[in-house]
Swiss-Prot record:
Alphabetized InterPro entries for the sequence: Cys-tRNA-ligase, Cys-tRNA-synt_Ia_DALR, Cys-tRNA/MSH_ligase, CysS_C, Rossmann-like_a/b/a_fold, tRNA-synt_1_cat_dom, tRNAsynth_Ia_anticodon-bd
Alphabetical keyword list: Aminoacyl-tRNA synthetase, ATP-binding, Cytoplasm, Ligase, Metal-binding, Nucleotide-binding, Phosphoprotein, Protein biosynthesis, Zinc
The protein, known as: Cysteine--tRNA ligase
Catalytic activity: tRNA(Cys) + L-cysteine + ATP = L-cysteinyl-tRNA(Cys) + AMP + diphosphate
Binding site for ATP: K268
UniProt xrefs under Gene3D superfamilies: Cysteine-tRNA ligase, C-terminal anti-codon recognition domain, HUPs
HAMAP family: Cys_tRNA_synth
PANTHER family in the record: CYSTEINE--TRNA LIGASE, CYTOPLASMIC, CYSTEINYL-TRNA SYNTHETASE
Native species: Shouchella clausii (strain KSM-K16) (Alkalihalobacillus clausii)
Signal peptide: none
Highest classification ranks of the organism: Bacteria, Bacillati, Bacillota, Bacilli, Bacillales
Subcellular localization(s) per the UniProt record: Cytoplasm
Length: 466
């Protein structure tokens, strides 16, 4: 049985879905105004692993993750670049897909966008207002936090501690400093939507509440996101949704730890970040993903060249074992002692499942993989081997690889479509910024990989050369 650490109760709990065999899962997605750094890539990678494992264990998973495609940061970026908000958002949504696809993150079943969910967001706020949980003030709408019983239950904070906390801004339009914004009145010349409270746009927290309700219903099984989202974002999502429906928003809350660099959280505001699309040029995307999964998702992971090189070497060892198994298979007849080895392989599978059942411990599951490789190497040193055993080893590597989203078979060094598109996008940006040196460098890199670019009036086209 799968157990997972529920941030709501601070305990590891057996996973019991609302509907047998089905999982409704939501993960807060990115605000699309720049490229993702490797810290931002951790939530998509680890929750993709969780989704894959739940699927492996027989659940039918519906996975939803949003795009925040209008917000202060995007508006600021658009103003700086002299572009439309929609153009900036579109570009970075493409870049997000390109990076996460290279990292072998499966697309969500649904990727709702704020700008496409506006009617539902407005209806959600209007219903909160009707119930007395929201009030209008000068074109803004706020949530009446103290009216919601249970505010603070996720982050474990009492209302009065929050009140004195420095993170709450004081704004005289609010009835109470704890109240937070649901709808923001538009500033002059700012992108806006019509609403019962005038022209404006939604606050950040309300989007997720409205999108979850629309796409998955009132109560979902798992709500996931980075640890920094616990407060205020997730606390506010709970308040909005539960005030409206009277039902629990999510039965299980999962929060991933940070990617640190020199023991400090990697973040855009600190400027200590490494972009995902840069690091996957230096190491393969597979190595980056494997590296990420060598730590348990809740523990902080330090980002360093040394650790990445370690992950690269480890992955190489596993791939070599698999290549040797394949090679051996081609020249083996069916003979040798089978039962003992088949039992060993079945035992490894059992241990892998036990580790993953225990709060998705991919770190320990990967050490089971290394043990499996060790066993495989011992087996191959025997004089006589059997096709059946070699196949059983290979099947298990393939099975684990599918769960982790990392392939252990050797591949030609070929660029994936998504990586090519990411590079072309980066070249477009470089050209726009008149950074022609970088633009040429990218053209050369693509040429080296036999990708031919063609500038057309409709934009850049590409094809693989012969
Ligand atoms: N270092 C990190 N490790 C793991 N997850 C992270 C890290 N930084 C951000 N995230 C996650 O990435 C997503 C986007 O976060 P956000 O845009 O706040 O990134 P950021 O770099 O921290 O930006 P800022 O410094 O502007 O807050 C969130 O889900 C957040 O939890
Ligand atoms: Zn959210």
């Amino acid at each position: 049985m799968i157990k997972l650490f529920n941030s709501l109760t601070n305990k590891k709990e057996p996973f019991v879905p609302i509907e047998e065999g089905k999982v409704k899962m939501y993960c807060c997605g990115p605000t699309v105004y720049n490229y993702i750094h490797i810290g931002n890539a951790r939530p998509p990678i680890v929750y993709d692993m969780v989704r894959r494992y739940l699927t492996y264990r027989g659940y039918d998973v519906t996975f939803v993750s949003n795009f925040t495609d209008v917000d202060d940061k995007i508006i600021r970026a658009a103003n700086e670049l002299g572009e439309e908000v929609a153009a900036v958002a579109e570009r970075f949504i493409k870049a997000y897909y390109a990076d996460t696809c290279a990292l072998n993150v499966k697309e969500a079943d649904l990727h709702p966008r704020v700008t496409e969910t506006m009617d539902d967001i407005i209806a959600f706020i209007a219903d909160l207002e009707k119930k007395g949980f929201a009030y209008e003030a000068g074109g803004d709408v706020y949530f009446r936090t103290r009216k919601f019983n249970g505010y603070g239950k996720l982050s474990g904070q009492a209302l009065d501690d929050l009140q004195s906390g420095a993170r709450i801004e004081v704004d005289e339009r609010k009835e109470d400093p704890l109240d937070f914004v649901l709808w923001k009145a538009a500033k002059p010349n700012e992108i806006s939507w019509s609403s019962p409270w005038g022209e404006g746009r939604p606050g950040w927290h309300i989007e997720c509440s409205a999108m979850i309700k629309k796409s998955l219903g009132d109560t979902i099984d798992i709500h996931a996101g980075g640890k920094d989202l616990t407060f205020p974002h997730h606390e506010n999502e709970i308040a909005q949704s539960e005030a409206l429906t009277g039902k629990k928003l999510a039965n299980y809350w999962m929060h991933n730890g940070f990617v640190n660099i020199n023991n400090e959280k990697m973040s855009k505001s600190l400027g200590n970040f490494v972009l995902a699309h840069d690091i996957i040029q230096q190491y393969s995307p597979e190595v980056v993903r494997f590296f990420m999964l060598t730590a348990h998702y809740r523990t902080p992971i330090n980002f360093s060249d040394e650790l990445l090189k370690g992950a690269e070497a480890g992955l190489e060892r596993l791939k070599n074992t698999v290549a040797n198994l394949q090679h051996r298979l081609a020249e083996t007849a069916d003979m040798g002692a089978e039962e003992e080895w088949l039992e060993k392989i079945a035992g490894a599978k059992q241990r892998f499942i036990e580790e993953m059942d225990d709060d998705f411990n991919s770190a320990n599951a990967i050490s089971v993989l290394f043990d499996l490789a060790k066993e495989a190497n011992i087996y191959m040193s025997e004089a006589q081997t059997s096709k059946k055993v070699l196949n059983a080893f290979l099947e298990l590597f393939a099975e684990f690889g599918e769960v982790l989203g990392v392939s252990f078979t050797q591949q030609e060094e070929e660029l994936l479509d998504a990586e090519i598109e990411a590079l072309i996008e980066e070249r477009n940006v470089a050209r726009k910024e008149r950074n022609f040196a970088r633009a040429d460098e990218i053209r050369d890199l693509l040429k080296e990989k036999n990708i031919v670019l063609e500038d057309t009036p409709q934009g850049v086209r590409w094809k693989r050369g012969s």
